[in-house]
């Protein structure tokens, strides 16, 4: 059993995509009994209860006293102490930038192998000269740098330098949790007073890049073609009031439901209530604000729902165009409206896409399959290359 230390700013109970990614992988690595895991992560509300549950599951979480960890002396000392105390063989930096700058220090403390994972924000880093030099140092100091999509790799590979060993490790989907669920669908449709109305769902943090504003603006056009069409926007974020005002200004406030943030255990049901899942994401900030992958599309597919994705970054990699869903220009209200209306009208095609999506995700995107690949990277098995 190899001994692994995960050093990360992003870990449950804090919510977010990276947090979920790391939490899912840690749970499966521990469950496989191939790795003894220790996690070093920041303090967060609810951490005590989470850490008790982690201990019961078979791994230890050590909390940094503040909510942010930087690659300075304080984190360095604590990390090296943990490496010594637990006789750590492999250090895994959950987000390469910036904490993986400590890779050489981890080796000095006794770690024989260092892995760093990327997610999407490194694309922005690669566009800034000083930040780009940080990525080069990380590439030089680690054994493996993982990436979540071919798109992100294409954008930042040169920044990590020729010495970096870049390996594909996307997020997975729990296909036992995310599945077609008629009972949950009926319950939530009753809660939100949707009845049998044709419904498009967008589940994501409410920020401009995700394209909820495009869906709201497209809804009048969709409703002219699809009687009773409704939009359910799931999630919280700084864009909420802007979206509420936009719905009012577009005359569709009565047909848009804002659920706010929902409990993690209710996320599968919110996918299941949809007839179509759409997130017309778009790239912003001259390419610095981009969708790294888009796990929500895969979760919707696992629930048997056809998906519509914007063509930002790695999002198209989560859709088999014209088979599991559609990829559209997320900047175009007309194209988004056409795609949504098309699938709401042609129910046979939509159902077939949903079934194909479920089959694809089950075959290619399960967490257990990807965790086995990560386990090889952590051990340094040549077969993983």
Swiss-Prot record:
Its EC number is 2.4.1.346. InterPro entries: Glyco_trans_1, Glyco_trans_4-like_N, Glycosyltransferase_grp1. Transmembrane segments: none annotated. The keyword tRNA processing does not apply. Pathway: Phospholipid metabolism; phosphatidylinositol metabolism. Pfam families: Glyco_transf_4 (PF13439), Glycos_transf_1 (PF00534). It comes from the Bacteria. Involved in the biosynthesis of phosphatidyl-myo-inositol mannosides (PIM) which are early precursors in the biosynthesis of lipomannans (LM) and lipoarabinomannans (LAM). Catalyzes the addition of a mannosyl residue from GDP-D-mannose (GDP-Man) to the position 6 of a phosphatidyl-myo-inositol bearing an alpha-1,2-linked mannose residue (PIM1) to generate phosphatidyl-myo-inositol bearing alpha-1,2- and alpha-1,6-linked mannose residues (Ac1PIM2). This is GDP-mannose-dependent alpha-(1-6)-phosphatidylinositol monomannoside mannosyltransferase. It comes from Mycobacterium tuberculosis (strain ATCC 25618 / H37Rv). The lineage of its organism: Bacteria, Bacillati, Actinomycetota, Actinomycetes, Mycobacteriales.
């Amino acid at each position: 059993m190899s001994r692994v230390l995960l050093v990360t700013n992003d870990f449950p109970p804090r919510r977010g995509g990276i947090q979920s990614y790391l939490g899912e992988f840690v749970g499966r690595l521990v469950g496989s009994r191939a790795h003894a895991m220790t996690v070093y992560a920041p303090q967060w509300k609810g951490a005590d209860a989470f850490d008790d549950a982690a201990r019961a599951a078979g791994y230890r979480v050590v909390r940094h006293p503040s909510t942010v960890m930087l690659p300075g002396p304080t984190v360095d000392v604590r990390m090296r102490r943990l490496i010594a105390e637990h006789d750590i063989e492999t250090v895994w930096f959950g987000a390469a930038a910036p904490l993986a700058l400590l890779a050489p220090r981890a080796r000095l403390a006794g770690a024989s192998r260092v892995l760093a994972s990327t997610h999407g924000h490194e694309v922005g880093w690669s566009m800034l000269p000083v930040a780009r030099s940080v990525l080069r140092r990380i590439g030089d100091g680690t054994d493996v740098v993982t990436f979540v999509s071919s798109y992100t790799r294409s954008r930042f590979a040169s920044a990590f330098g020729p010495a970096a060993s870049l390996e594909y490790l996307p997020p997975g989907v729990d296909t036992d949790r995310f599945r077609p669920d008629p009972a949950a669908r009926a319950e939530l449709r009753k809660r939100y007073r949707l009845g049998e109305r044709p419904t498009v769902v967008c589940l994501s943090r409410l920020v401009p890049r995700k394209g909820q504003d495009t869906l709201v603006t497209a809804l009048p056009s969709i409703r002219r073609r699809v009687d009773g069409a409704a939009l359910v926007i799931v999630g919280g974020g700084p864009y909420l009031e802007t979206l509420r005002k936009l719905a009012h200004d577009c005359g569709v406030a009565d047909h848009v439901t804002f659920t706010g943030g929902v409990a993690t255990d209710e996320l599968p049901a919110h996918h299941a209530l949809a007839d179509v899942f759409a997130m017309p994401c778009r790239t912003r900030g001259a390419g610095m604000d981009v969708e790294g992958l888009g796990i929500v599309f895969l979760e919707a597919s696992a629930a048997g729902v056809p998906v519509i994705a914007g063509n930002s970054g790695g999002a198209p990699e989560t859709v088999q165009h014209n088979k599991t869903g559609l990829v559209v220009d997320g900047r175009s209200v007309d194209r988004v409206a056409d795609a949504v209306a098309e699938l709401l009208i042609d129910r046979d095609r939509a159902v077939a896409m949903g079934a194909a999506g479920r089959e694809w995700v089950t075959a290619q995107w399960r967490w257990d399959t990807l965790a086995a690949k990560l386990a090889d990277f952590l051990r340094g098995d040549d077969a993983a290359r």
